[in-house]
Every structure is written in C-alpha cells, then in structure tokens.
Amino acid sequence: MTFDENISRILVKDKEYEMPFSKGLLARSLTAAGMKPSESYTLAREIERDLNEQNVLKISKDELRRRVYYTLINRDYEGIGEKYLLWRRVLKKHSIIILVGGSSGVGTSTIAFELASRLGIPSVIGTDSIREVMRRSISKDLVPMLYESSYTAWTALRRSQWDEQDTKEMHLLGFERHVEPVLLGIESIIDRSLTEGTSVIIEGTHIVPGLMGEKYQSMPNVIFLNLTLSSEETHKKRFTARAKVSDRPLERYLENFEIIKEINQYIVEKSKENKVPVIENVSISETVQKCLEIVTERFSNLNDEPIIDSDMY
C-alpha cells in the first residue's frame, strides 16, 4: 500500500473527529514540554515509524498520548513526559486564559503566538483589536483618551487636569483612562471563555494587573504574564524591526519613547505589586521557555488527577 509521505495514513481519533497523524504537531507538543526541537522531531518520526510497522491505521488520542509518554520514560525523559501529559490533560478539562501584558514594542504579540503554537491554543486576541471594538460603542466625546494611542492619551485629558499633575503623572493618568474601557472588553472575553469552556491568549498594552477585576487574579486558570525590556537600545530596535514589516511609523514611536518607557515601568511596578511574573524579553526562545515554566506550574495546581491513570499499560 502506497501513501503520500507528507500525509500520514495513520488516523488519530477524537470523540468528534479524525485527523491524520502529524509529526509536526507532536514535535511541537514535545518542544513545549521542554525537549529540544531536533530531538522532538526525531522522536515524533520514530513513533510514526513504529505505528506503521505495527500496521496501526487508527489510534485514539488517549492511546497515542500513552505511547508518547512511555516512549519518553524509556528514553529517560520522565520530566518531559509528565509535562506533556499534564498539559494535554489540563487543556482537555479546563479553559485556560493566558494574559500577556507589556508596553508598546516589548513583543507581547510574538510571545503570545509562540505560546499558542506550543500549547495548541487556537485563539490569540490583541487588545488593540478590542480597543477598536470599544471605539465603535463609546463616543469620542465621552472617552477621548480611547481614541488616542496608549502613549498619547494624555493629550486628550481636560486642560484642568494638566495643571493638577506633574508631567509623568499626567502621562500615566492618560494611559489609565485609555486602558479602562478596553479592560471591560478584555474581562468580557475572559468571562465568555470561562463560560463556554474555551481557551484563549490575550496580549497587549492594555493588560495591567491591579486595574483589572480582582477576581481574575485569584482564578487558577487565568494566568498573567508581563514582558519588559530594560535596554533602551533593544527596545528601540524592536520598533525599527516592526516598522519594516508594518505600516506603523517608526518616528511616532521614537518621538514618544520616553513616555513609552514610563508606561513600561508603570506596568512592571503594577505587576510586581500584584505578584505577576515579570519576564525580560531579550531572547524569544528563552522568554517562551520561562513562560511555559510558569504556565506548567499553574497547570499543576489545576490537575486533580495522577499524571498516569491506573489503567495505562
């Protein structure tokens, strides 16, 4: 029997659907659990080879996970095996909401999409998109700060407020007024995800610990992460790189860089006050790994079953 080498003849069965076995998907899951990418793909290829040699044409997702786990154990990857099963089990039973915050240019969208890919979470929502939705329901006359960028929102404050604040306080007050209506949209998405049992990653400048509802801080399946960049040079280079692949004007960011720095420091301080992890996002791979470690620790608190069921072979 012949088959396309790029499309596996092995079907993986779930309750509602069947799909071809994917070495790439399995390798991604193993990498998320801490295995090196090259090793994860090699192991995924070996598992596919073993299934073909045993003439397995259909296999349930649970059975495949058992095989992967015991293969990892036999290769002395016990820790990775436990993480692999933990993530699959928790994501199957619980809705997971990961909130990735940070000021403009620190890389929240990049890290959010990397985490979504590793964890198999299908939905990533940027807070800029939520802001656009809120603009359609709230008039500019009512909340003019919403119609500005996070770092220019202070210019929409009433003139009387300018006299009451020093410059930095005015910048941060404008930022807070800009963020507040967007938080309503963020909280609505979280509530809906929890109700419907779906997982989502939300990323962007508008995620500020301490400004969101307190109830979310105590929810074990709502995970806050904050990214930062201490190096001004690195931060500015991120804006330069962004300008090359988007229509966002570099000059606008650089002209307002001092305010962006103030906002960054404000979010970091709020994160520390609320015991939210602050991660220096210099290396994407290292940041993703640190985030995954934090997420794994939270997953452990959600998992109320032994890693391996007693009926596993």
Curated annotation (Swiss-Prot):
Transmembrane segments: none annotated. It comes from Methanococcus maripaludis (strain C5 / ATCC BAA-1333). PANTHER family: P-LOOP NTPASE DOMAIN-CONTAINING PROTEIN LPA1 HOMOLOG 1 (PTHR33477:SF3). Coiled coil: none annotated. This is 2-phosphoglycerate kinase. Pathway: Thermoadapter biosynthesis; cyclic 2,3-diphosphoglycerate biosynthesis; cyclic 2,3-diphosphoglycerate from 2-phospho-D-glycerate: step 1/2. Residues 8-95 form the ATP-cone domain. It is an enzyme of class 2 (transferase). Its cofactor is a divalent metal cation. The keyword 4Fe-4S does not apply. Catalyzes the phosphorylation of 2-phosphoglycerate to 2,3-diphosphoglycerate. Involved in the biosynthesis of cyclic 2,3-bisphosphoglycerate, a thermoprotectant. GO terms for molecular function: ATP binding; kinase activity; phosphotransferase activity, carboxyl group as acceptor. NCBIfam families: PRK04220.1. Belongs to the 2-phosphoglycerate kinase family. It holds the Pfam family ATP-cone. InterPro entries: 2PKG, ATP-cone_dom, P-loop_NTPase. Its EC number is 2.7.2.16. It catalyses: (2R)-2-phosphoglycerate + ATP = (2R)-2,3-bisphosphoglycerate + ADP + H(+). Keywords: ATP-binding, Kinase, Nucleotide-binding, Transferase.
